[in-house]
Amino acid sequence: MREYLDSKSQKKVALLEKIFYAENHTSTQEELLNDLNITYPTLISTIKTINFDIERFGYKAFSIVHSAPNLSYTLKISDNCSIQLIINAYIRESPKFQILETLLLASFPNLQALSKKVHVSYSGIKKEIKELNEELRERNLSISTGNQVEITGDEFSLRIFYAFLFLVTYSGDRWPFSFVQYDEITDLLESCPKEIYRANSIDKGMMIHYYVAMHLLRDRMNCQIDTTRQFKVALYKACTEESKKSESAFIKKVAKQLPNRNYKEITYTTQIILSTIVAFGSYSSIEKMPSFFYMDEQLEEMGFMKLVDFASERVNDNLSIPFSEKEMELLRYSFASINYRYFLLDNLINRFNNIVPGYTDLDRNIRKIHKVNHLEPLISQLVNLKEMRLLKPFEERLASDYLIILDKRIDFSIHTLPIKVTILSTISNETAVFDFMRYFSSYYNLEIINQVDPVVDLYISDFSVSPEVLTSLRINQPIVYVNTRWLESDYVKINDNLAKIARKKFIANKKD
């Protein structure tokens, strides 16, 4: 959503982030001038404006402080505040966001009326709407300026788009819906069939609350999803007696929120809410595949679960140590959820990394790079198989989405062969072993060998070992030399060596 920022706000955010991501949240004046390509007067005025904005936003826990002796600037930030709050506040004040939020709730007779409402010039409004429409067209939406100024297009697409827009820009900072409170949505979700969602779970909870609130808002505005709308997949319906009872209770609670709708309309809109909840699935609180996936006749006709089972078995076949029954069920559930999301939402959230920056950047963690490097070829091979042709329309997203699933479902400390490590120390290796395991054990299957042994894959030592000693001890494996008290650079060296060894522990030697 950062593309909604105007040029002035973009420069402010760039300066903020430059200081924030610097060591100790401190940047020198020279770094800021050179890296941001600005003059000294511009730097001073921008910082002054940012500090004023931060106070105006109500985030007094933030401020940029100038250190004259060091010619540097430091971002003072308390533990209960986040830089994302400031960025979101700038987005909410941007003309593009103001236009979108205003048009969600009302239409206008002409551009002049909208211009007056959002305090943007007439020429500015035309420019902003033109740029917004370039993005909205991808979602089957547009801002019409014909007989009146309004947002038009597919109503289901609109609800998804606005739910994420509000989720990202308002987040947990404030609740933007005045007609219903957050805890009222929670109460409604308590009646949701437990096989698809549990209201007491925090996993994706805020996202679901925002979507349900947006869905109810549009229904209350008499903006209904056309009952003739074609979806590429069957809408959710309860298949077991327990789920049918929950579904009925859920419908009754939705009816209380929409008192002017008849039973048929309530049933249809509820079905879409539940289907969307299913599509956002792979919830941590759900440990078993929802019965809907394997009992619905339409899903069976399209070969939905055959696709899920094929992908799951293919992944399992490529692990050195296979999944347990429970782990396999969770993988199948994740694949079913993401595939259902593809068919239901189509291309509505095609650029998810633009919506939530960094969400797909798994390799930011250097200890995960080897895992990503192992999984990417597997996924590339999988998604190009003829058995996966049903997902061909979504191939651009498959690689990154499936990588997230496999990263979550495959524990490399369990499903790869062990890497045997010996840690040598001048005095005692006990502390080093503890630090080593604490830092790496979630990313590699590690086994400590407390002796010199041919089975050892890697030696780590805080003292040098001569070639003569290596020969006499018959040590042919690599040795990583580290400081007595390990530094960050030591961990990086160790990780690089573990990653090289891990390549042999994943797929290639599984059946050797």
How would you name each of these model-derived features?
Residues 1-512:
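A cross-family "folded-core" feature that marks the main globular domain of proteins
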